[in-house]
Amino acid sequence: LVSSGATIIARTHAAQVKHMNEMFERAILHPGFAVVETLSECTMFNPGSFDDSIPRKGGVFDLVNEEEQDLESVAAAMDLSQDLTPGKFGVYYETKRPTKNELEREWLTDARSKIGDLSERDLLRQRFASMR
């Protein structure tokens, strides 16, 4: 997911509604490409498969300690993601980088300074015409 440009990656569980809402809210408010993996057991084929992570069933909902975890480290995020039993929950990776919209605005501003005050549509038409 990092190679696809994700700037925040988190894992939550459907049985932990408060945590799930926190992760969704954090992802929505994060500027950039956000991914929240939401685990949910299939009661038909794998009943009880996530009992180890549900406190009301005797399990432990193990959270990522963001104070100790280097959230900007791709290697640390990969290490967390390798534990499939069901692993830790929370934010695995978070970084700041320019968003697509910010880069596009920068490109448009730069293009306008070179070409003149054209509309965004006219700038794109001119750019595509130059590629022919």
Describe the role of every protein-language-model region.
Residues 32-38, 89-91:
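Generic beta-sheet signal
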Residues 29-34, 56-59:
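Short, structured secondary-structure boundary patches
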Residues 21-22, 30, 41:
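Hydrophobic pocket-lining "lid/loop/helix" segments that shape and contact the acyl-thioester
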Residues 42-132:
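Flexible, low-complexity linker and terminal segments
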Residues 1-3, 27-30, 80-85:
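Solvent-exposed alpha-helices and their adjacent loops that cap or buttress functional pockets
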Residues 1-26:
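Conserved thiamine diphosphate
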Residues 9-12, 35-39:
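Short, conserved beta-strand edge motifs with alternating hydrophobic and charged residues
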Residues 25-27, 51-52:
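Short low-complexity, flexible loop/linker segments enriched in glycine and/or proline
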